[in-house]
């Protein structure tokens, strides 16, 4: 219902921008979709409203790192399942759960298209090969508590953690090339792989 989604603290995704003031300790995900010459791009980043708790900062760091674990697991001729296995393993070892109801997706002339890109192992995704020219998003959502979510009963859009625990997300749009994954939504001033929060 808005141009961007702003998801604060326990909001996993699809948060609707409002007039609630941000306060110290909040973590805020901003998810933006663009259309350039008929092609879609999708990116999100979680920001810290300092000072934040150590647990919030660690969640954001691990989620950011999980994005690059997924990107590095993608390769031409590999499968979508390779991405999910890598992210799930990394997140679980760090003590976090991976949201299962929402996932990455193919993207191009349409915003959502095949293949679906789950961030956890799904047997069916073993069939989805990453061919040169495949464009898709990787957008892990990690929670401190349960992986389960619920949709807000009032606006029927905002997605929250079922237990009220913090959630973080990062996302890039990826193009699979003959030489491997290319990040289409990377920016000069944005955080790069290895960034520390």
Walk through the language-model features, giving the residues of each:
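Active-site neighborhoods and metal-handling regions in enzymes and metal-associated proteins
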Residues: 1-197
